[in-house]
């Protein structure tokens, strides 16, 4: 997405890209709103290490060595009963000549909160909104609405904090090159939605093939991100129309005891409106984004 300073010439299909991005963001907002209506009763199931499970198997799987937003350590854990499914996916990919790479797993409430506030992330959201509006400073209401989708500002939207989601990439076993999905993890643009029409045909097919292998073992794709898959949470049960109460809600996890405790209130935003307003003012100043008419 272009920035105000040193902005490249608009692409011939710039308006179409903006239109799709807005459509996608509103679609995601509606999906997450519907997710809130899905009944959830935390079952208390503990977590298991994905890396330990892989080490005890014959599956070749990789793990990200980067940090979240620069300095937050990743936690490669997921609900215990989901481990066999991930191993099966990894084995299927190995048989195809691929390697599944886990980019992210469980996130604590603190991690999810900090992620949404870090300048590296928040500035990207602000810049994307500025681009969406054709070069106008975004309102706080738009930033709040987009943050709900892009960084799960409400706990009952965050499947990572439920211990039910993984972010993934895929690589070739023979030479270690990435299986292209249009852009590498992590991307925030009109290429991010799983069904983006602005991704080349080969990358679109790779997205489809990876999703088919993930969903064969129950890990459903999130339409808003080509790397995100989840199972057993409210979004999963809503999409599959299971008719069941979701057993996984956002939880605090004690790694020493492997005990989980449900959040007290999943409907309160991690970053409240007044603080988000302050962050927006800081970001606009930091980025130098002003109306074209000024």
Model-derived regions, located:
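Conserved metal-phosphate-binding beta-hairpin within the catalytic cores
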Residues: 229
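Extracytoplasmic cell-surface/polysaccharide-interacting catalytic and binding patches
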Residues: 1-105, 109-223, 236-294
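Catalytic and binding regions of secreted/periplasmic enzymes and modules that target cell-wall glycans
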Residues: 226
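Active-site beta-loop-alpha junctions enriched in small/polar residues
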Residues: 232
């Amino acid at each position: 997405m272009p920035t105000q300073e040193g902005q490249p010439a608009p692409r011939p299909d710039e308006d179409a890209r903006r239109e799709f991005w807005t459509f996608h963001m509103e679609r995601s907002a509606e999906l997450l709103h519907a997710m809130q209506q899905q009944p959830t009763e935390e079952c208390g199931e503990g977590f298991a290490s994905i890396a330990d499970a892989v080490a005890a198997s014959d599956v070749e799987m990789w793990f990200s060595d980067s940090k979240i937003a620069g300095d937050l350590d990743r936690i490669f854990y997921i609900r215990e009963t989901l481990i066999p499914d991930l191993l099966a996916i990894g084995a299927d990919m190995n048989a195809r000549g691929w390697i599944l790479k886990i980019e992210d797993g469980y996130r604590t409430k603190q991690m999810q909160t900090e992620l949404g506030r870090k300048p590296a992330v928040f500035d990207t959201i602000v810049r994307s909104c500025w681009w969406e509006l054709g070069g106008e400073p975004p309102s706080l209401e738009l930033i709040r609405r987009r943050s709900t989708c892009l960084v799960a500002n409400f706990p009952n939207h965050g499947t990572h904090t439920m211990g039910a989601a993984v972010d993934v990439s895929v690589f070739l076993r023979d030479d270690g090159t990435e299986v292209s999905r249009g852009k590498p993890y992590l991307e925030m643009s009109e290429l991010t939605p799983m069904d983006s029409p602005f991704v080349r045909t080969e990358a679109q097919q790779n997205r489809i093939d990876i999703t088919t292998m993930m969903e064969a073992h129950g890990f459903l794709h999130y339409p808003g991100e080509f790397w995100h898959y989840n199972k057993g949470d409210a979004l999963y049960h809503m999409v599959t129309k299971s008719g069941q109460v979701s057993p996984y809600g956002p939880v605090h996890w004690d790694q020493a005891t492997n005990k989980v405790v449900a959040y007290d209130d999943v409907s309160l935003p991690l970053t409240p409106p007044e603080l988000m307003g302050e962050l927006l003012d800081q970001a606009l100043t930091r980025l130098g984004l002003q109306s074209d008419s000024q």
